[in-house]
């Protein structure tokens, strides 16, 4: 009898085992709700701990294929370890996503209320964001449930919740007290639209058609080049920044200019004397060999400036317009008087690109414009604002990371933290060994406000609260303090993710139990922005009972990117984004077109995307269910490589779920109302007799268990999926189920009982083996199969059962060898049928030659299997000297299998049919050869198209060779 709690799950699964196809929409959402309500996702408190912290998705986001891919891997690991008896925690939560969230809400109030954030003021606008989060911020959580993620939702965190805010403040204050945080003026990526510094990850570099301007800079004090010229020609793609030049670099080995090093040029328009410096940054082979150096508006120039102590001049305001008066700083960002701050008044207030035209025109007017060349360049754009980013000198807060980087490098070097695959360690070391101080301030309203206050003299005080600042510094209540307006970089709070979500800075039981986490599953693109910073922050703030720095995770599993079928990156602007929920539930063509083009402002692009979508999905997208999607994702999870999404693969794995479903229907129909051996628990001798096929499938299953364990333990989810597919489809369904039919239709109760017992027990264990990847279908079938099996359950859901363990004693090598021989014998007969176009249902006489003792034993023991599955009329063993009639033949080991052809085929008709097939294939092969021999086609066609044509030719030639061989055989009859 099923237990009462188990009935709750069964009630969700209407008795549909006899339906021909599995319909995932019938059960997925209700089954997930039941799992969640019954608390199966929560830690049990028993066993060794195993934990994963999810990379927190943006609160503004919705599920994309990258999320689906990584989360399927994480859930597979969590379910696997839970079934291994571990005390599992999958910690989830969302990131407040500073700039992205602020932008979403700004757009919302502009569209709905015709207001800006300034109309609300800072506090009012932040209230609007919290309102928006309550209404819309949970979308991604609902979508994650659809993936089957076994997350303990009661522990969900948000990077702006009270506990996280406390942790962020604590970290900032302690770092400041340790002299690891400072405020300084340095060059940052400045977004002139959003008026904030942004990280490198938020900069999108795009190819762009531009120009290279060659400008003449007069040499000062009568200096001349080796060629006798009294000027240098500099080449630049950004002539507007020349107003901020503080040097000209030449290569110290360049014979044209090396004697000028230490001399000066008179900078046109501003009449500023600036030095000529020797630096390898100047390439003798590139441009004119002379490079203008603008430390205040170019990152490379800034490094050159530091090497040669060149002042930094800022010529732009926060809107990237020309200032009336320049700002001059030394290399440390301190104000200095190295140069006059005057700028030409005619350019003041001009946008940088308007100023570019005006400055070029002025150079032309003065006879200082040498030439303008077309030039392909890469320009940095804000990924959200869409405007060109400006390197700008601004006051920002920074973390001194050099001291933090050392232990973080050592943790990977000494094996405390392991990258999977290992090759990513080199990328990590490369970045860590050249690490720059981290700019952590952002000029936004939404985020963790920097816990720093200023008095009327701009002296800065850092503390957890204003009250603490006043108390620690004896500041009177009537003395006004102003809190810093900036907020912290989103990556600052997410760098604390693994330990802050477990209650730090308090010393909680969760922190002791689940930290460090076991594995981080993430993409290589954020090794620097998140992974490295998590390691640095965690090791600085967390120590074990012996005072040793604690790591955030033991392993880092790096995934590749999911790309479209052509290998291109998925993006809304390309219209090639695949929504995982559309793969699960299906979507009509009309709805898909609306989703991809509905909000597009560019009609031409929308038209192009519509055409592409109609071609790719003429009927829309069919529903495939969550299990098929998850199995597809694990099957392509080769370590670290990018993946081209393939709808055909997804369709293939939907067919796989149907195959499993139908196999289970067969098992249930042949066992549910019958004695499967479980009625004799004392196991009396003679109760059950296992056939060769039973012993073979049990051994094959054990080998599959071993392979899946090894694959999961080494993060080779692709190999685990491959092993499960191979066993389920090819061995269990295609062979074993067919081999059970002769036994089940015989009148031998012991053999029938043995086969039924094997059917239910192998299927039950197979469902547990597959469950981490395919949770829904396995739970559904397991609820019905388990009561028929020997397996003693622990709890009511498959997810809390024991994962199968490899048992070598169940691997009967002789049974495996014998059954493989039986399979090869049957395949040989089937191949002859196929080659000779003989009906599969026609019973055939078979003659055998070269039969050894082992072959004879196998024939005697398995005649029932051979006759049934190969559809044989008779099996005759020929004497050694006996010649058989004209026959089609095949070889199984040393054994020759002959099928006499007399009376089986119409020789002339078959030869005529083969001649037609040969003619057709020769034409096709000739056509493709001609195409591939066409130089014009080969030079212009994409590599994928050429590969497709080459595959066509190989297929045609292979088939042609087989048919020609077949023709020779038939002609000889």
From Swiss-Prot:
Keywords of the record: Aminoacyl-tRNA synthetase, ATP-binding, Coiled coil, Cytoplasm, Ligase, Nucleotide-binding, Protein biosynthesis
KW ATP-binding (keyword) present: yes
Location of the motif 'KMSKS' region: 569-573
Pfam families xref list: Anticodon_1, tRNA-synt_1, Val_tRNA-synt_C
Coiled-coil regions listed: 901-970
'HIGH' region (motif): residue ranges: 57-67
Catalytic activity as recorded in UniProt: tRNA(Val) + L-valine + ATP = L-valyl-tRNA(Val) + AMP + diphosphate
EC number: 6.1.1.9
Family membership noted in the UniProt record: Belongs to the class-I aminoacyl-tRNA synthetase family. ValS type 1 subfamily.
Entry protein name: Valine--tRNA ligase
Native source species: Colwellia psychrerythraea (strain 34H / ATCC BAA-681)
């Amino acid at each position: 009898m099923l237990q009462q709690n188990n009935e709750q799950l069964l009630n969700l699964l209407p008795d549909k085992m006899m339906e021909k196809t599995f319909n995932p929409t019938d059960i997925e959402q209700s089954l997930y709700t039941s799992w969640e309500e019954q608390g199966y996702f929560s830690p049990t408190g028993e066993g060794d701990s195993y934990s994963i912290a999810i990379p927190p998705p943006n609160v503004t986001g919705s599920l994309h294929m990258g999320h689906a891919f990584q989360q399927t891997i994480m859930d597979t690991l969590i379910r696997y370890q839970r079934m291994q008896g571990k005390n599992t925690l999958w910690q989830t939560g969302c990131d407040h996503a500073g700039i992205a969230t602020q932008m979403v809400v700004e757009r919302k109030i502009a569209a709905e209320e015709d207001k800006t954030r300034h109309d609300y003021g800072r506090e009012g606008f932040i209230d609007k964001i919290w309102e928006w989060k309550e209404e819309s911020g949970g979308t991604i959580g609902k979508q994650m449930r659809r993936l089957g993620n076994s997350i303990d939702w009661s522990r969900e965190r948000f990077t702006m919740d009270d506990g996280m805010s406390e942790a962020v403040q604590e970290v900032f204050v302690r770092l400041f007290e340790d002299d690891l945080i400072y405020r300084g003026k340095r060059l940052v990526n400045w977004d002139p639209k959003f008026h904030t510094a942004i990280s490198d990850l938020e900069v999108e570099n795009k190819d762009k058609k531009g120009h290279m301007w060659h400008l003449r800079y007069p040499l000062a004090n009568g200096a001349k080049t080796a060629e006798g010229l009294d000027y240098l020609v500099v080449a630049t793609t950004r002539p507007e920044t020349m107003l901020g030049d503080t040097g000209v670099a030449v290569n110290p080995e360049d014979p044209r200019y090396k004697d000028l090093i230490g001399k000066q040029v008179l900078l046109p328009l501003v009449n500023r004397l600036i030095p000529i410096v020797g630096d390898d940054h100047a390439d003798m082979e590139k441009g004119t060999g002379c490079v203008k150096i603008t430390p205040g508006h170019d990152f490379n120039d800034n490094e050159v400036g530091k090497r040669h102590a060149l002042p930094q001049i800022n010529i732009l305001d926060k809107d990237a317009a020309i200032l009336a008066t320049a700002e001059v700083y030394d290399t440390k960002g301190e104000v200095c008087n190295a140069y006059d701050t005057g700028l030409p008044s005619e350019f003041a207030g001009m946008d940088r690109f308007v100023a570019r035209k005006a400055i070029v025109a002025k150079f032309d007017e003065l006879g200082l414009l040498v030439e303008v060349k077309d030039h392909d360049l890469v320009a940095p754009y804000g990924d959200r604002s869409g405007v060109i980013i400006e390197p700008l000198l601004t006051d920002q807060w920074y973390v001194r990371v050099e001291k933090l980087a050392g232990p973080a490098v050592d943790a990977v070097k000494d094996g405390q933290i392991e990258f999977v695959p290992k090759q990513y360690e080199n990328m990590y070391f490369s970045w860590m060994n050249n690490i720059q101080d981290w700019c952590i301030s952002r000029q936004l309203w939404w985020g963790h406000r920097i816990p720093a206050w200023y008095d009327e003299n701009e002296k800065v005080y850092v503390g957890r609260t204003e009250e603490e600042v006043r108390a620690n510094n004896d500041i009177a209540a009537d003395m006004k303090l102003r809190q810093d307006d900036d907020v912290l970089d989103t990556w600052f709070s997410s760098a604390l993710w693994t330990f802050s979500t477990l209650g730090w800075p308090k010393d909680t039981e969760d922190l002791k139990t689940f930290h460090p986490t076991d594995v981080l599953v993430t993409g290589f693109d954020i090794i620097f922005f998140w992974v490295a910073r998590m390691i640095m922050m965690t090791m600085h703030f967390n120590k074990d009972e012996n005072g040793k720095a604690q790591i955030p995770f033991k392993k880092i599993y790096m995934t590749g990117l999911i790309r479209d079928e052509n290998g291109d990156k998925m993006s809304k602007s390309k219209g090639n984004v695949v929504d995982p929920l559309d793969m699960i539930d299906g979507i009509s063509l009309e709805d898909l077109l609306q989703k991809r083009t509905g909000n597009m402002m560019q009609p031409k692009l929308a038209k192009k995307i519509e055409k592409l979508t109609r071609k790719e999905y003429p009927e829309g997208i069919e529903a495939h269910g969550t299990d098929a999607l998850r199995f597809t994702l694990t099957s392509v999870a080769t370590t670290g490589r990018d993946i081209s999404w393939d709808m055909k693969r997804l369709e293939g794995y939907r067919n796989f779920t149907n195959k499993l479903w139908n196999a289970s229907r067969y098992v249930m129909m042949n066992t549910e109302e019958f004695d499967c051996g479980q009625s004799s628990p004392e196991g009396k001798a003679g109760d059950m007799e296992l056939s060769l096929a039973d012993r073979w499938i049990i051994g094959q299953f054990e080998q599959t268990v071993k392979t899946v364990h090894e694959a999961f333990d080494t993060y080779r989810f692709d190999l685990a999926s491959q092993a499960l597919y191979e066993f389920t489809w090819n061995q269990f369904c295609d062979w074993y189920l067919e081999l059970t039919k002769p036994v089940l239709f015989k009148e031998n109760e012991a053999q029938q009982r043995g086969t039924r017992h094997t059917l239910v027990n192998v299927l039950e264990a197979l469902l547990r083996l597959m469950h981490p990847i395919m949770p829904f279908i396995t739970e559904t079938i397991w609820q019905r199969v388990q009561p028929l099996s020997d397996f003693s359950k622990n709890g009511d859901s498959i997810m809390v059962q024991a994962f199968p363990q490899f048992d070598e004693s169940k691997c009967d090598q002789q049974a495996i060898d014998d059954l493989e021989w039986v399979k090869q014998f049957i395949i040989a007969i089937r191949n002859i049928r196929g080659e000779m176009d003989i009906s599969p249902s026609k019973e055939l006489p078979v003659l055998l030659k070269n039969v050894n003792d082992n072959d004879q034993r196998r024939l005697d023991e398995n005649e029932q299997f051979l006759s049934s599955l190969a559809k044989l009329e008779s099996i005759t063993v020929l004497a050694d000297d006996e010649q058989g009639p004209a026959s089609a033949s095949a070889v199984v080991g040393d054994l020759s299998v002959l099928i006499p052809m007399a009376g089986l085929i119409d020789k002339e008709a078959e030869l005529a049919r083969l001649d037609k097939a040969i003619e057709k294939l020769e034409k096709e092969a000739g056509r493709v050869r001609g195409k591939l021999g066409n130089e014009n086609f080969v030079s212009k066609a994409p590599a994928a198209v050429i590969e497709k044509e080459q595959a066509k030719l190989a297929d045609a030639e292979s088939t042609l060779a087989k048919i020609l061989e077949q023709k020779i055989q038939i002609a000889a009859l």
